[in-house]
Amino acid sequence: MSKDNLAQGILRFFSGSYLLYRTSWYKSMFVDLDHETYPDKVWLSAHDERDFDLVNLGSSGGKWAFDYTGIDIKAMNWAQQPQTLLEDYNLLRHFHGILKPGGYVLITIMPFTGLNKKTGLMDAMKYVWLDIQGKPIQPFMFEKAQRYAMYPILFKKQALKALIRYLMGKDKPCDYRREPQLDYNPMDVNELERDAKRWISGWKNQFGIVDFDAALTDENRIGREYRVGLMRNLIDFCEERGYKPVYVIPPVTEHLAKYYTPQFEERYIYGYLKDVGRDVVLLDYSKDEIFRQDDSLYFNSFFLNRKGRQLFTRRVLEDLGIKLH
């Protein structure tokens, strides 16, 4: 053991890092600690599967849209809640080798995929423990994220609270959500209406939007230009390697969809894809009445529940012409 490694080990011991590593609070900051979601070096050494038929990218909309369980297809869901388009692109660049020639790359298109999202420490933290080489999945603040991942006591009050809970035997998983695993919608109509309004209000605050039908703000226009270039790079990356990129717009409930005016959809969704200017297949389920009118397929006004995900996934695969057994 080198002197540097010995010093780091001593520092981690006396800072409580080894105990903090065991806490649910610490584990909840990262994706794929079990190395089962992404085919990093740990996954590749433990699995023989290769030549996958399909992967999907995306943020929360993609995470809660696709479920390949029980379907005779080799596929992976690489979406996270949240996940930026840059992170989608970098995940694909690192892990695309798992795809077979001609494999599908489903790119989930959400209402604000065309606007850039500000990122911070926690965005970089998510991917720190993926076993990869080269450029990090989220390069912004990555070095700081590495330090905080190694020495979580740097989070100060949060770390101390987590450590105390652990030592008192009160450590509980803090990232488990039962709602997405349900086969029904736990919300009634009034709750769904309020939930939809919360999403609309949250998006307006996040992106500085007063009126969805108004022109883009200067900041969002700059973000749009960046996202246009990034999507072009992602599409070109797929096509240069013989993969088939596909845009997929998942459905939402009528409670939320009614706020998507034609002007809003053109400005934030279809206008963005037109600006990208690539000839990509678009599977658009935003107007699909089977999904839009059936609240029981969701766990809130926005995201599909387990039953909805399985139904939607089969529908997408069938529309791609993939034969299911």
Model-inferred region functions:
Residues 10-80, 85-95:
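Membrane/wall-proximal cationic-aromatic binding patches
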Residues 56-57, 61-144:
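Membrane-embedded segments
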Residues 51, 100-104, 242-244, 279:
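A general structural motif
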Residues 89-91, 224-232, 262-272:
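Well-ordered, non-membrane alpha-helical segments in soluble/globular domains
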